[in-house]
Structure formats: C-alpha cells, structure tokens
Amino acid sequence: MTEQAQREAELKRRKVRKGTHSCWECRRRKIRCQFGAGNDTVCLPCQARGSTCRSQEYVDKDARPSQQPDRRMAQRLGRLEELMARLVDRILPEAGGQLANRSTTQSNRGSRSPSPDSAQNEGLAFHQTLDVLEASLGPNTPAGLLLGLRDAAQPASMLTPESDHSPAPSKLTPSRNSKTSRSLYALFPPQEALPVLMKANAGPYYLTSLFSSFRDLIEGKVETANSVTVIPPAVSHPTVLARRLLQICICMQQLNPGYDTSPLQIKGTIPEYMNNVVTTVTNLVTSIDEIVSTGEGLESLVLLGLWHANAGNLRKAWLTYRRALSLGQLMGIDRGSTRALKFVDTNTDPQKHSTPAGLWYRINACDRASSLLLGLPAGDLDNSFATEEAMKRDTAMERLEKIHVVLTGRIIERNATRSSSEAYAVTQSIDSELERAATSMGADWWSEPDFDVTDETGHKLGEMLRQMLQMRHFDLLILLHLPYMLRDPSENRYDYSKTTCARSSREVLKRFIPFRSKVTAAWACRHVDYSALVASMTLLVGYLRQHQHATEPAPTCKERNEDRKLIEVVRERMQHVAITNRDKVTQESADILGQMMPILDLIDRSLMGDLSECNSHVLKCLHLKVPYLGTINFHPNVNVPEGQSANTPYSRRDNAGTIPGPVSVAGAATSGLEQLQPRMAGLSTAHDAAMPSVTAMSQGGDSMQVDMATFDPALLPPDTSIDGMYMDFDEQPQDGVHEIPDLMAGVEDWVLQGLDTTYWSLLNGNNMAWGG
C-alpha cells in the first residue's frame, strides 16, 4: 500500500467506544460478533453469510440511506392488505370501500363483472375464511389483538363493547342476510294498513309488555304499543323483521271472524297470509342458528311458539319453546349474563330492550305450560325469577303468575314421581301454596271480570288477563288433584281432591262462557279452550263415582241440572266458535262433550228408578276411546265376588286382547242405553278416528260402542292396581288407518295433539302416559 493510501485509510478511521468489537454487518443484524480464533480477520456470522466483515473503526462503505424492503415480504404484505380490504368490505361496506380504493388490485377486480358462478365460489371461499378467522380471533387471542378485528367488525353506530347490548357478529355474509331481509320485507302489509289492524284488538299492548314488567312499562322502559305499527327498514337484520312479522300475525289471530280484511291489503285470507309468514320466518330465520342467535331472534322464537299454541299446534309450540330455552342457556340469560345477549335493532332505544331476566321468565312460563298439557318434562326447573328479590317490583298479578309457573313445574315433577306416597305429599304441599297465593289476592280480585270487547285501551287487556289468570289457577287445581279424583270411595283422604276438582271445574266454566261470548276468535287465547274441555270432562267424569261410601254428600238433583246447563252452554259456545271460525279444536271439544253428556242421563234415570229389572241393568263398565291411546274401560265397584280382594283387578273378559291395569273406578246405574246408538250412528269413519267414544255395558252383556281409534299394546305399562279401583284396555290390531300420526303433525292431522292422552293418563294416576 502506498503512503498516500495509508494516510487516507488513517483519515477514515473512527473513534469507537472501548470494548466495541462487532463488525458493521453484525451490528445491523443485532447479533453477536464472534471469531473462531484470535488471529481471524472475518467473524463467524460474516463467514456464514459470505459478507464483508469490516470493523466499526472504519467507515461503512456499504451503508445505504434507507433499507429497501424484502421483495417477498412486500408481496406478503400486499396479499394481507388485499385480504383485509375484502374482509372489511364484507363487514363494513363503507369502510371496506375506502380501503379498497387504496388497493390497486382490489380496484382492478371491481372493474370486472363477475359471473354468478364466480361470485358464488368467492362467497363460499370467503365464508370458509370467516370460519377460520372467527375460530382464531377470540377476545384474547394474539391474532385478534394484533389485527384489531374485534372492534373493526362493529359498526360505529353501535354501543361500546362494555354495553350490555352490543351487536353480535354473524357468520353469514351480509349479502346473504340482505337477501333474507328482502324476502321478509316483501311479506309486510302496506304501512298504512298496520294502524288499522292494531286498532282492532288489544294485541299490541300484550306483545310490547310480554318480556317486561308493569313497572318497566310505567317507567318507560318498554316500547309503546304504537311501535308495533312501524315496519322496520328493509336493510334491518332478519330477526328484527321476523319479530315484527310475528307480532303482526299474533295480532291477526285476535281478529273476530267476519273482520273486513280489505283495508289490510294482504294476499289471500288471513289464515293463508299467516301460514305464509310463519313458514317463511321458520325457514329463513328461526331454523338458522347463525341468524337467530340475537336478542330479537330469541324473542322471535317465543312469539313463534305463541302463534303455534294459539293455532292449536301444541307440539310445534313446545319444540319452539324448547329451542328458545336452549338458545337462552347458550346466551347465559339463565345466569343473568348480558355479554352474549346481543340486540341488532339500531332503531330501538337500547334501554327498551328486553332484559335477560324477563326473557328467561317468559320462556320458562311458556315451556312449562305446554309441557304440562302434553305430559312432557319441563326444560328447566330454575325458579330464580320467583324469589322475593326478583318479585319485589312486581304487581300482585305478576307475582301470582310467577307462582303459577313455579307450581306448574312442581306438578310436572310430581307427575313423574313413581312413589304414590311421595306424590300425594307433594300434591298436598302444592295445594297449600295455591291456596296461600289465592288468599293473597283478596276476595274482590276473584270476582268474575267484565270488559268491553270494543275497548281500545289497556283496560280491556288487563281484565282479560285477570280472567285468564283466574282460569289458570283453577285449571292447575284440576290437574293437581285429577289423579285422585276417582280413587276408592272408601278412602276418605281423597274426598278433598274429588271436591276440589268439581268446584274448580265449575269456576273455569263460569268464566269461559262470558270470555268466549266476547272473544269469538278461535285463535285468540287458545288455552282457555283447553281449560274448558278439561273442566267439562272432569265435571262429567266426577258423576261416575259412587257416593254411598264417601263422606261428602252426593250432588243433588238441582246441582246436577245446574251442571248440565253449564256444560250445555259451554258446548254451545264451542260449537259457535267452531262454526264461525271453521276451527277443528273447538269442534272436537264440543263433540267430546256431546259424547259424554249421556253420563248425566244415565245417572238421572238410575236415581229416578226408571229401571226395569234393575239388577240386570246395573252399569257394569263405561268405555272411552281416546285417539292414539286406546279404549279405556271404567268398572264400578259393585258386587265384588266373595273371597275376591278389593285390590284384585277384575278377571279378563273373553276378549284376549283385554289388559288389566290400574284403575279409577266409576259407579252408577243406568237403563235406556238404546238411546245412545241413534245419536252416534251418523258419525263418519274419519270423524270417528279422531273422537273418543262412550260405551256402556250392562250385566246382561248388551253394549254399544263407536270405534274411534286403535291402541298399540306396546305402549301400555305393566299391570297394577290402585286403591281397589279398576280399569283395563281393549287391544285392537293396527290396520294402517288409525296409526299414530307424525310427532310434529299439525292440528289438521292431530286435533288435540295428545292433550286428551295426558288427561286420561292423569286420571288414571299417571300410569298410561307414553311419552306425550
């Protein structure tokens, strides 16, 4: 090296800190600079990379003003930016559009018109991408915190994440939701028709307070009744539109027959319109997990169940309530949690959204009511909504209603109890609680309500609710004591149950008559029809038991005549509703009562002595055929052969298909049975298949019977006996005509939906149930 070069090199030397030994390349990479031997001039990392190893004592000739990005890294970042632009564009169209404008690739793609196939494939691929992202972007996952997608996926107009009612993201793309929303929006009547509809009934007042308390209504925490008349925007979430459509349908159920539907401007009749709406909502909303999982979706499930219950589809209603209950548990509303309860209606004040407690109570109330009627277990037995703390703001009627829900659950549990002694103890306990609840209301509250059917205010609704709550109370008493009504007359402990059933039945019927005289729409408050049917059958069956061994006096002739008139008026009301509404439920109920009314005729004839050869015409048994259950044969405790135990069932008759079973025995004498046959001879085969029949058999062997259904012997429990009372079943072969219908059959195919099966099962001490 020349002297000039050495001088220049010396000039380029830099002063470095003492102890600095790393080269420039290791410093840039922030790695430790190590040498293999003391005399090495190139460090090990530079040897591995093949780079120049220059000490920091010398100026770095390779230093560049700015570090150029790695080409592969730039490509990866570009793809990530493109993916993020597509993602945000799907979730937030406005924000996504802005981001897309900054992406050349995205802009170029937008200039082309994709084919339907490519759009579908792109949507499928994006849906799969969302699945992966949703699985990896939990609240505390590194990817979620790094990308910040949790906050970006929420519209700015929504509440903060700390809010109890923040919106819930959906796995479905907004484009699919938009298509669903458009389909639902097309079902609405014209906006100007809704005020006319809502003015014709008190439904809006009931619907807006369904999930709230009266105190919330007073404090303005509930939507007004007028809100039901407002159609949500077409871009609303599908559950928002579905909820309003179901509210409209329930209001239509309250319309009296003959209502002029022309102002509503709907296609077809009201039943046709409602069925179309319910079918569409079921297919597009309530059956899609990703859509229905919102607060409005939970409300829609309850409303759908109410509609089915009023329409007579008890089983579909039960299944819908059970779905709502399961979804509510997933949301945590049974634990009071609001984190997963997301409301998506941005046009409603968040303070007026339903509370978890209100939703949980209403779901349980509906589920238990339908479960009791169908003989099924309750979905949940949590009673947190009925604690003193939970009811401190409730009115007296609200407290009574919640107590009824609690006791309904206890009756369901009692019915599943196999120990007779334990079941009877539970029955006495429930009866005491019902009596205590009734006393707390005061005597004036129990007077029969009177309301003006033309009243357009909330007063009409209040009186209707009071009347229905009274009927519900007496209905629970009937179903509570029904298993003990036909027990052995010599057992005095059952006399109270017999008397309670008869008294409660009369109270139900006395309220049913004025109610159905004013509210003549068959689909309005359907449960009052079921209550009237149960009460009427109970009052009639009560006359079958003997009174000579019982401590309570037998009904006098005057009482029998009053009961006869009461049931006849009830039957006339049912027939009127059936004819004016073309309703199968009330028609079937009226026909059942017509079949059972001869019981009173037989009692009158026997007590009046209008019997020839009385000893040979004493009533031996009464046969009732229940659809899809079989023939129930009631035997009176008469002329028990000497040496035969009172707890021994009657020997089987010549019919090999007769199966002895537990029994609540009836006792009465009769003659003039020939009058039954002309009354029944005109019934058609199709009608017979759905109607119970009454058959009386004398000791002489004469009998008259109308075949109504068949029975599968595999559904029967083992032979048992209860308190010396007897009942058996007649086995009939399945002929393919009267087979059990589909479990989810509607009211058109299965009118009473198994309600009659539950009734006779309870009357028999709950030994005949076959699963609902």
Swiss-Prot record:
Transcription factor; part of the gene cluster that mediates the biosynthesis of sordarin and hypoxysordarin, glycoside antibiotics with a unique tetracyclic diterpene aglycone structure. First, the geranylgeranyl diphosphate synthase sdnC constructs GGDP from farnesyl diphosphate and isopentenyl diphosphate. The diterpene cyclase sdnA then catalyzes the cyclization of GGDP to afford cycloaraneosene. One of its GO terms (molecular function) is DNA binding. Keywords: Antibiotic biosynthesis, DNA-binding, Metal-binding, Nucleus, Transcription, Transcription regulation, Zinc. SUPFAM superfamilies: Zn2/Cys6 DNA-binding domain (SSF57701). Coiled coil: none annotated. PROSITE patterns: ZN2_CY6_FUNGAL_1, ZN2_CY6_FUNGAL_2. This is Transcription factor sdnS. It comes from the Eukaryota. GO terms for cellular component: nucleus. It is found in: Nucleus. CDD domains: fungal_TF_MHR, GAL4. It comes from Sordaria araneosa. Its main location: nucleus. Pathway: Antibiotic biosynthesis. Residues 94-121, 156-180 are annotated as: Disordered. Residues 23-53 bind DNA. Gene3D superfamilies: Zn(2)-C6 fungal-type DNA-binding domain. GO terms for biological process: antibiotic biosynthetic process. Residues 100-121 have a biased composition (Polar residues).
